[in-house]
């Protein structure tokens, strides 16, 4: 439902029958990571709000030398202070997606509201999604647009992208393809795959920008390389049709 997208790479299969030779440099790097994780854990246990959130993220995604453990991540996020917007947001993400706790969309929405009160851009964006879909609150597209705009003004790429979608379809705001394309372009510059794809659509069909199939192809390729399925499909269609590129069914 939310804009939350995991960004970690899945670790290799530990049962993979291969011989791994660690160089002294890699061993030193591993030691530094372990020490950094221990320092972060100690700071979190001492009450450092940023460290608490970082430990939660480490455990949620299996990054920073921590093992992936959603339940432990939830416990860390639960220790955040009631006035910490980042911690409240991540706790909301856990409830929203069922990470380490039973899914509770209403609770997630309330946490996003508390976090958004501190103008935390990711929470503003997710709260906008709640109002757009009617999750935990009465559906209100105008309110969703307002929240997406505030998130966009805070420089949050998904806020910019979602605002662009509202302009593109005229939901909660007057339809304006030029403003939609502008929002997509802002988010695409921040390398958001969804925005790269949507800007590519605008370029392919001339929606809000001058039609430019070559640019659309480049945008689709960037988003596809990042694993965005719709972009991979669009890229395949262009190769199949030979639009902006030599026709190539094998590449499609």
Walk through the language-model features, giving the residues of each.
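Short helix-capping/linker turns of helical repeat alpha-solenoids
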Residues: 45-49, 61-63, 82-85, 97-99, ...
């Amino acid at each position: 439902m939310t804009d939350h997208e995991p960004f970690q790479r899945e670790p290799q299969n530990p049962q993979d029958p291969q011989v791994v030779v660690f160089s002294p440099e890699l061993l030193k790097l591993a030691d530094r990571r372990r020490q950094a994780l221990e320092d972060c854990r100690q700071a979190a246990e001492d009450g450092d709000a940023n460290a608490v959130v970082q430990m939660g993220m480490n455990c949620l995604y299996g990054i920073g030398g921590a093992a992936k453990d959603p339940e432990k991540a939830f416990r860390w996020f639960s220790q955040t202070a009631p006035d910490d917007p980042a911690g409240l947001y991540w706790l909301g993400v856990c409830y929203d997606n069922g990470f380490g706790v039973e899914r509770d969309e209403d609770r997630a929405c309330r946490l996003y509201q508390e976090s958004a009160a501190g103008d935390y851009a990711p929470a503003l964006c997710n709260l906008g999604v709640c109002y757009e879909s009617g999750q935990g609150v009465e559906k209100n597209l105008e309110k969703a647009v307002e929240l997406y705009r505030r998130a966009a003004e805070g420089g949050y790429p998904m806020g910019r992208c979602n605002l662009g979608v509202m302009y593109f379809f005229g939901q909660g705001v007057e339809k304006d393809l030029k403003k939609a394309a502008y929002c997509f372009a802002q988010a695409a510059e921040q390398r958001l795959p969804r925005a790269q794809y949507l800007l590519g659509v605008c370029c392919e069909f001339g929606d809000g920008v001058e039609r430019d199939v070559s640019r659309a192809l480049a945008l689709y390729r960037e988003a596809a390389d990042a694993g965005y399925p719709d972009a991979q499909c669009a890229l395949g269609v262009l190769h199949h049709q030979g639009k902006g590129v030599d026709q190539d069914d094998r590449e499609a």
